[in-house]
Curated annotation (Swiss-Prot):
Region (Cysteine-rich): 22-37
InterPro entries documented for this protein: IV_Tat, Tat_dom_sf
GO cellular component: extracellular region; host cell cytoplasm; host cell nucleolus
Taxonomic source organism: Human immunodeficiency virus type 1 group M subtype A (isolate U455) (HIV-1)
Motif Nuclear localization signal, RNA-binding (TAR), and protein transduction per UniProt: ranges: 49-57
Lineage: Viruses, Riboviria, Pararnavirae, Artverviricota, Revtraviricetes
Binding site for Zn(2+) 2: C25, C27, C30
Protein name listed in UniProt: Protein Tat
Region (Interaction with the host capping enzyme RNGTT): 49-86
Region annotation Core: where it falls in the sequence: 38-48
Misc. comment: HIV-1 lineages are divided in three main groups, M (for Major), O (for Outlier), and N (for New, or Non-M, Non-O). The vast majority of strains found worldwide belong to the group M. Group O seems to be endemic to and largely confined to Cameroon and neighboring countries in West Central Africa, where these viruses represent a small minority of HIV-1 strains. The group N is represented by a limited number of isolates from Cameroonian persons. The group M is further subdivided in 9 clades or subtypes (A to D, F to H, J and K).
Gene designation: tat
Residue numbers of Asymmetric dimethylarginine PTMs: R52
Length: 101
């Protein structure tokens, strides 16, 4: 590498200027597009997948966040529907009649 004169401004250092001239749409010095192309070409808009944020852990103060919920027994239905009893009787009666056939 060539030694750089410390008295030179940074934009005058060798290699700091673009090799090609700036176009009327895109400036290589400032890397900005004109407003028309920015809106027309949709520059700066990406429809790609967004990165998910990592899940946060439990709060620092509590050891287990589920200890606050009191445990209750699950409700059990004691009643048996009449439709089930009738269907059982029909199956039993069919089984008895088929046995003799």
């Amino acid at each position: 590498m060539e030694p750089v004169d410390p008295n030179l401004e940074p934009w005058k250092h060798p290699g700091s200027q673009p090799t090609t001239a700036c176009s009327n749409c895109y400036c290589k010095v400032c890397c900005w597009h004109c407003q028309l192309c920015f809106l027309k070409k949709g520059l700066g808009i990406s429809y790609g997948k967004k990165k998910r944020k990592p899940r946060r852990g439990p709060p620092q103060g509590s050891k287990d966040h589920q200890t606050l919920i009191p445990k209750q027994p699950l409700p059990q239905s004691q009643r048996v529907s009449a439709g089930q009893e009738e269907s059982k009787k029909k199956v039993e009666s069919k089984a008895k009649t088929d046995r003799f056939a």
